[in-house]
């Protein structure tokens, strides 16, 4: 059969139609600068993205250093601002060093690929974020996917390995369900088998611990020489970017070998300045971390979720993707924006509303959330 005259992209129409039929079509929605609706969808957990100090920090960096870094940090993109922020972040999180990337995604790619490679083993939690999954695929290491939060399975995989090096990968706070990794137990297993533990604190920073220093700090593992932390600047810190924290030797290795660092333009100065200012606010106002969990507990009660949340995330399982999409749309029609997670982001049959608590939610906003969520969820569950 000749293929002459056929569009090489004709197959996209069939794929799009199939996704639409399965309720998995995604659309971009434009957000105004000041949203008219109540936001229970964003990851701005501490409410800092619009904080005056954070805005001033971004503007000052913009005026001082310009709109962009101008190149890779190995060429022209490394400024005093970047390095000062890395010291600030490492000090706050109890790490020896930090290296800033252009996003949390590239931080995970850079760290895991550079710290594994052919002839090594990666043991990754089944619910690890897509950036960690992609890093596993790019690493050329042997990858074992362990059942969610199953320490015994991790132990068995490490005990059976023939590779000299091994990395165990987990999120501290899992992004879809908001549950916590058993970090102390995982670390004990890693120590017993001589494995590195890599922990993504994207959803732990700013929320867990009495001062918002993350789950590693909370459980007494911050700064451990056999742990590498990754995190993002785009959630609790209300900015953009990512970072890898750990021993100084890790930082030096990443500068030499992490392709998502070497071949990427440095993080924009405005994002660095905003993140630095946000970190200062969090350091001065640690009560914001507790406020997030308090508001999450209220949202869980409103949504009929019986298990008390341990993070900013309240996951409301509805099952069918069309029901979840319809519920999210109904909430938005009544002035409340919520997250909607469907496959492949979550497993089939677990489509859900994802509610994200913020420290800055007011009593009036919580009253609106109660009114809307109670009505919409009653209909969705009927």
From Swiss-Prot:
Sequence positions that bind substrate: 26, 129, 345
Source organism, top-level taxon: Bacteria
Pathway it works in: Cofactor biosynthesis; biotin biosynthesis
N6-(pyridoxal phosphate)lysine modification, residue list: 235
Gene3D superfamilies linked to this entry: Aspartate Aminotransferase, domain 1, Type I PLP-dependent aspartate aminotransferase-like (Major domain)
A GO MF label: pyridoxal phosphate binding
Cofactor(s) in the UniProt record: pyridoxal 5'-phosphate
Biological processes per GO annotation: biotin biosynthetic process
Catalytic reactions of this protein: 6-carboxyhexanoyl-[ACP] + L-alanine + H(+) = (8S)-8-amino-7-oxononanoate + holo-[ACP] + CO2
UniProt cross-references to PROSITE patterns, sorted A to Z: AA_TRANSFER_CLASS_2
Enzyme class: transferase
Classification via InterPro entries: Aminotrans_II_pyridoxalP_BS, Aminotransferase_I/II_large, AON_synthase_class-II, PyrdxlP-dep_Trfase, PyrdxlP-dep_Trfase_major, PyrdxlP-dep_Trfase_small
Assigned EC number: 2.3.1.47
Residues noted as binding pyridoxal 5'-phosphate in the record, renumbered to the chain: 104-105, 175, 200-203, 232-235
Annotated keywords: Acyltransferase, Biotin biosynthesis, Pyridoxal phosphate, Transferase
Oligomer status and interactors: Homodimer.
Function, as annotated: Catalyzes the decarboxylative condensation of pimeloyl-[acyl-carrier protein] and L-alanine to produce 8-amino-7-oxononanoate (AON), [acyl-carrier protein], and carbon dioxide.
Entry similarity comment: Belongs to the class-II pyridoxal-phosphate-dependent aminotransferase family. BioF subfamily.
Official protein name in the record: 8-amino-7-oxononanoate synthase
Species this chain originates from: Mycolicibacterium smegmatis (strain ATCC 700084 / mc(2)155) (Mycobacterium smegmatis)
Lineage, broadest ranks: Bacteria, Bacillati, Actinomycetota, Actinomycetes, Mycobacteriales
Gene: bioF
């Amino acid at each position: 059969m000749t293929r002459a005259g056929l569009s090489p992209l004709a197959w996209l129409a069939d794929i799009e139609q199939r996704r639409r039929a399965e309720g998995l079509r995604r659309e971009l929605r434009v957000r105004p600068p000041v949203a008219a609706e109540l936001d229970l969808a964003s990851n701005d957990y501490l409410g800092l993205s619009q904080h005056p100090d954070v805005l001033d920090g971004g503007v000052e960096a913009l005026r001082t250093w310009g709109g962009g870094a101008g190149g890779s940090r190995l060429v022209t993109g490394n400024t005093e601002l970047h390095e000062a922020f890395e010291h600030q972040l490492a000090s706050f999180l109890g790490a020896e060093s930090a290296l800033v990337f252009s996003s949390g995604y590239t931080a995970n790619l850079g760290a895991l690929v550079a710290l594994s490679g052919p002839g090594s083993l990666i043991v990754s939690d089944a619910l690890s974020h897509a950036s960690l999954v992609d890093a596993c695929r790019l690493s050329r290491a042997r990858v074992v996917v362990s059942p969610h939060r199953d320490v015994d399975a991790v132990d068995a995989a490490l005990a059976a390995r023939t590779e000299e090096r091994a990395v165990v990968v987990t999120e501290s706070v899992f992004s879809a369900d908001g549950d916590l990794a058993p970090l102390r137990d995982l670390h004990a297993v890693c120590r017993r088998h001589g494995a590195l533990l890599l922990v993504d604190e994207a959803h732990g920073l700013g929320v867990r611990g009495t001062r918002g220093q993350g789950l590693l700090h909370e459980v007494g593992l911050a700064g451990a020489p056999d742990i590498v932390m990754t995190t993002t600047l785009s959630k609790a810190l209300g900015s953009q970017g990512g970072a890898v924290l750990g021993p100084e030797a890790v930082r030096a290795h990443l500068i030499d070998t992490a392709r998502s660092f070497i071949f990427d333009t440095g993080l924009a100065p405005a994002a660095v300045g905003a993140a630095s200012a946000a970190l200062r606010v969090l350091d001065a106002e640690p009560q914001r971390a507790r406020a997030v969990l308090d508001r999450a507990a209220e949202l869980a009660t409103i949504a009929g979720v019986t298990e008390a949340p341990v993070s900013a995330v309240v996951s409301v399982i509805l099952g069918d993707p069309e029901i979840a999409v319809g519920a999210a749309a109904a909430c938005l029609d009544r002035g409340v924006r919520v997250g909607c997670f469907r496959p492949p982001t979550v497993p089939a049959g677990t489509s859900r509303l994802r509610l994200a608590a913020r420290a800055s939610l007011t009593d009036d906003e919580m009253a609106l959330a109660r009114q809307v969520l109670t009505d919409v969820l009653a209909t969705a569950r009927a």
